[in-house]
Structure formats: structure tokens, C-alpha cells
Design a protein with these regions (language model features):
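Interfacial helix-loop-helix junctions of multi-pass membrane proteins
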Residues: 82-98, 139-164
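Extracytosolic (periplasmic/ER-lumenal) interhelical loops and adjacent juxtamembrane/interface segments
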Residues: 62-96
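N-terminal signal-anchor transmembrane alpha helix
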Residues: 38-65
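Small-polar-interrupted transmembrane alpha-helices in polytopic inner-membrane proteins
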Residues: 46-54, 125-147
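Hydrophobic cores of alpha-helical transmembrane segments in multi-pass inner/ER membrane proteins
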Residues: 105-111, 162-179
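Short, highly charged, low-complexity non-transmembrane loops/tails of multi-pass membrane proteins
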Residues: 181-198
Length: 198
């Protein structure tokens, strides 16, 4: 129901109570666009904090060992942090390995440019084959290394991770925003219909 209404031109003549349905669509859609922008900015802000933490862990190691180890501990839940597979900064390894750093860098860049190349209220995802193609290099690099067929190097780990993270963002973000805002549209429309029927 929601997809159908949001994709239709504003030419509907049906009404909800005394209010033209087109006007309600415009009202709900306007509120939805604002909420999408807020949610996007919140997600971007939280991810920036997460991304900065990758650099804070090595930076604080010689200044506040406890806090540094705490940050390393947090990132250890999502990354193996192997020294030989990590970049070093401030004379210490980063909070995540080179591949994970590439993934998160790709995600961050994707989030920053996303509003300039796609509307935030466009919840459609690109063709799945783009995602498959983007994940393939990382999959091949990681799998061949895991099987002992070859040893990768940090630059390749970063590049393959970056490609995967950048492209994956264009699938994850619209789905996430779509789920949140479609629920809001249903609630708004149902509430208005109920109020006008009294």
C-alpha cells in the first residue's frame, strides 16, 4: 500500500473523511522527508564517531593506555586485529585490520556522497549484480588467503574492502531508511483515517 501511494503522481481524487487524499499524501510525505534527513544525519554522526575510534585507539595508546585498550577491545568484537594485517599510525596498529578499515572507509565515503547522487526518500536498491560484483574481489582475496593458496597484502585488502563497503552502502542505507519511514506512513494514514471516520 505504501509503495503504491508514494510512487503515484499526486493526482488521486479519493478522500479520507473530509480531507482530499492527495493533501494527506503530501502532508505525510513532507513529514517523512524531514524524518529521513534527520535519521540520515544521526546515522552519519554515529558512524563518524565509530570511524574516528579506529584512529583514537592507537593515538591514545601512549597517552591513556586504559582508554586505548578499551577502544581496542570494542573493535576486537568485529575484527581480528592481526598486527601483520593492519595499518600502523602513531606507531601503533589501527583499531581494525586493513580490510575492515577499507570497508568502513568505503561506507563513510558512500554515506557522504549518497545525498548528492540519490534522493534519501528513494528506497529502491540498485541491481543485485552490482553488489555481487563488488563483493567478489574481496571474497576471492579473502578465500584464497584463508585456504593458503596465496598471501594477500594490506593495500589489496584495503582496496577490495573499500569497494565492498562503498557499494554495499547503497543497498543497506535505502533499505534501512525505507523500513523506518514506511512504518511511519502506515501509522499516519491509519490514524488520520480513524480520526476522520468518527
Amino acid at each position: 500500500m505504501c509503495d503504491e501511494y508514494l510512487n503515484l503522481p499526486i493526482e488521486i481524487t479519493r478522500t479520507i473523511g473530509e480531507i482530499p487524499f492527495t493533501e494527506k499524501i503530501k502532508e505525510v510525505y513532507s513529514k517523512m522527508k524531514k524524518k529521513i534527513s534527520y535519521v540520515y544525519l544521526i546515522i552519519l554522526f554515529l558512524f563518524l564517531i565509530f570511524y574516528i575510534g579506529i584512529f583514537l585507539a592507537p593515538y591514545l595508546y601512549d597517552k591513556n593506555r586504559f582508554l586505548s585498550l578499551l577502544i581496542y577491545g570494542i573493535y576486537s568484537q568485529i575484527c581480528h586485529q592481526m598486527p601483520e594485517r593492519s595499518y600502523y599510525i602513531f606507531n601503533h596498529k589501527m583499531g581494525v585490520c586493513a580490510r575492515c578499515f577499507g570497508i568502513y572507509t568505503g561506507v563513510l565515503l558512500g554515506m557522504l556522497i549518497y545525498p548528492f547522487i540519490r534522493r534519501l526518500d528513494n528506497f529502491k536498491t540498485p541491481n543485485k549484480w552490482y553488489l555481487i560484483l563488488a563483493l567478489t574481489p574481496m571474497g576471492i582475496d579473502g578465500t584464497t588467503q584463508l585456504l593458503g593458496l596465496r598471501e594477500s597484502f594490506n593495500e589489496l585488502r584495503f582496496i577490495t574492502g573499500f569497494i565492498a563497503g562503498f557499494v554495499a552502502l547503497f543497498y543497506i542505507l535505502p533499505v534501512f531508511l525505507g523500513v523506518i519511514n514506511k512504518e511511519k506512513v502506515f501509522i499516519e494514514m491509519k490514524h488520520t483515517s480513524h480520526q476522520k471516520s468518527k
